[in-house]
């Protein structure tokens, strides 16, 4: 109950900040014809972000009980809905209106709302969760639990939010390049989900197992869990790299029959292939740190990598180095992510092993 309250308040606060920044879109020198497209899409992305945080709050509840299967199925279903609706609403397929970029935003929002509804309905319908439902609705909220929840949960939520913000800023940069680049960007963004889903599932399992060994103060086993997850993650990353590299030339045709889009998507997916290892590292070790309840450095590390390194490099690559080569600017924007994601992965890796000894923790009160 306390976790959902805090998660909702934080989601609304971050969403409000993002909406408050919307007037500054005009300072990114977008084409005048793109401004009417960029603003609605930006608003939809912000709303989707708030809904996504609500889903994550429910998902963590299930993960904490080691019931990871249902959230996984719902997440996969949500991705499928998102892909299908993107195809339908961007290009007017299946009898749906042709809304272009606005349709992409609507598709993302609908899929995330559906995910929240499905997981929420399962909570109310599952008979085995009777005690949890009773505890959720019975009595008043114990305010004493809010502080430790805030200290643990806020950095994790902010870290996820900052990563989302990093990719949202990339959308603004791409919108400045042009509508053709936006179409390719949307395809690339959809393909990136392939690796993320695998790593996020592995990361959730890592957090659960590490938290178990932290509870019994067996930090050697906690390190063993992280090392095993790291090794499994490397295999997953190489599988994702091979698949993405193999489909890069034809995947755009699943979303757009325009064959001119295929070469741009193919070349832009190269940075996505490269950053799979870094993305895996940051997801696995962010979750390992969550299991240790050592999350203080998540925020400064995320600010450095997601709000400074990625946007600054993306801007420099696209609008300084490639200012006179518009055909390479989309690739340049995405080329910032292998650097930022690998950097955050290395920093979180080091932080985990630095703080994984029993002596590094304060005695329990």
Where are these regions (language model features)?
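Residue-level hotspots within pore-lining transmembrane alpha-helices
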Residues: 13, 46, 50-51, 77, ...
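Transmembrane alpha-helix boundary and packing residues in multipass membrane permease domains
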Residues: 22-23, 60, 87, 91, ...
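Short alpha-helical transmembrane segments in multi-pass integral membrane proteins
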Residues: 1-50, 96-154, 210-275, 317-365
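Helix-terminus/linker motif at the lipid-water interface of multi-pass membrane proteins
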Residues: 23-32, 88-99, 161-194, 212-213, ...
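Small-residue-rich hydrophobic transmembrane alpha-helices
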Residues: 1-15, 19, 52-71, 184-248, ...
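Transmembrane helical elements of multi-pass membrane transporters/channels
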Residues: 44, 78, 111-115, 119, ...
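Short runs within selected transmembrane alpha-helices of multi-pass transporters and secretion channels
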Residues: 44-63, 71-79, 104-119, 200-203, ...
């Amino acid at each position: 109950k306390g976790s959902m309250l805090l998660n909702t308040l934080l989601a609304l606060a971050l969403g409000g900040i993002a909406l408050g920044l919307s007037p500054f879109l005009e300072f990114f020198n977008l084409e005048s014809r793109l401004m009417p497209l960029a603003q609605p899409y930006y608003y939809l992305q912000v709303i989707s972000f708030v809904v996504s945080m609500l889903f994550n709050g429910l998902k963590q509840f299930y993960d904490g009980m080691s019931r990871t299967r249902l959230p996984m199925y719902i997440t996969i279903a949500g991705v499928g809905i998102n892909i299908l609706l993107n195809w339908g609403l961007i290009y007017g397929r299946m009898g749906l209106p042709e809304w272009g970029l606005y349709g992409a935003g609507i598709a993302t929002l609908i899929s995330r709302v559906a995910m929240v509804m499905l997981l929420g309905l399962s909570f109310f319908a599952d008979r085995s969760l009777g005690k949890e439902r009773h505890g959720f609705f019975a009595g008043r909220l114990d305010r004493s639990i809010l502080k430790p929840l805030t200290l643990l949960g806020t950095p994790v939520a902010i870290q996820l939010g900052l990563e989302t913000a990093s990719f949202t800023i990339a959308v603004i940069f791409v919108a400045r390049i042009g509508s053709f680049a936006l179409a390719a960007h949307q395809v690339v963004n959809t393909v990136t989900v392939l690796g993320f889903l695998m790593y996020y599932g592995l990361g959730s399992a890592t957090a659960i197992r590490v938290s178990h060994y932290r509870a019994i103060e067996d930090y050697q086993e906690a390190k063993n869990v992280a090392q095993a997850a790291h090794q499994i993650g490397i295999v997953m990353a190489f599988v994702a790299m091979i698949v993405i590299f193999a489909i890069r030339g034809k995947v755009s045709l699943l979303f757009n029959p325009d064959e001119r889009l295929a070469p741009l998507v193919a070349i832009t997916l190269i940075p996505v292939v490269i950053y799979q290892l870094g993305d895996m590292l940051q997801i696995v070790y962010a979750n390992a740190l969550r299991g240790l309840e050592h999350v203080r450095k998540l925020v400064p590390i995320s600010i450095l990598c997601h709000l400074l390194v990625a946007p600054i490099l993306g801007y420099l690559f696209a609008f300084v180095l490639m200012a006179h080569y518009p055909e390479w600017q989309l690739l340049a924007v995405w080329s910032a992510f292998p650097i930022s994601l690998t950097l955050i992965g290395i920093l979180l890796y080091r932080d985990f092993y630095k703080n994984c000894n029993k002596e590094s923790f304060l005695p329990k009160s």
